[in-house]
Structure formats: C-alpha cells, structure tokens
C-alpha cells in the first residue's frame, strides 16, 4: 500500500490538480499523459495482490516484479510528461528540469529492481524508496531556495 502512496505523492505533488497551459498541444499532452499514468497505477494495484500472496517467497514472481517496477517507472515518467504541459514547467524551470532528470534516473532504477526480482518485502521497500527520491529532491531544492521563484524571467 505504501508503494501506492508513493505513486500518489509523486503525481499530486508535481502535476495533480493543475490545469495545462492554455495551448492546444499542452492540453492534448495533459490529457494523453494521464492514460498511461492511470493504467500504471491500476496495474500496480493489481500486482500488489500477487506481492502479498508471495510475501514469504525467496524471490518475487517475475510478472509481479515487472508489473510493479515498470508501473512505478511509468508513473515517474508520465508524471513528468504531464508536468511538462503545466505553466509551472516554464515558470519553475530550476525545479522541474532537474526534477525530470531525477525522475528519469529513479525510473531506470525501478526497472533494475524489477529485473533483480528480490524478495517481495525488499521489492516493495526499494520501490517506495525510489518513488520518494524525486519528492525528497524537490523538498530539498525548495528548502534550499534552488527553485526559480514565481515571476522569474524566462531564458
């Protein structure tokens, strides 16, 4: 369940409850970006049943590991695709550009964890940790004052 919270925090902290820029391309990007995002969240939820069923196994079943790990990677990637359609993407470049790179690295690491197929507990904990990296990065960046303040001129 904590993996689901990680996906939820990733989306709602960076893209959720925000409208796209008032441009046709941004609107289409925002709409279509939500399709793989919601599919990944649903798939992750379905795979959690198998993760719990195999909680005492020495390795996570391959299908379960891949669905959970790929789902987490898709959530990280598509959240940034959706975020790129927002006005904040342009207004807060100092936050969102490095955040997108951090999310991409975390997404690749999610796939690596899935390929390794550790025990179900380790898989779940690893995905929670990886989903928290972009959030932790953004919090640290904001606390350090490294994000572009509102109204920063565009380059």
Predicted segments, located by residue:
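Short, intrinsically disordered terminal tails adjacent to the first/last structured region
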Residues: 150-155
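Predominantly late transmembrane helices and immediately cytosolic-facing juxtamembrane segments
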Residues: 1-112, 129-149
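Loop-to-transmembrane alpha-helix initiation sites
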Residues: 117-127
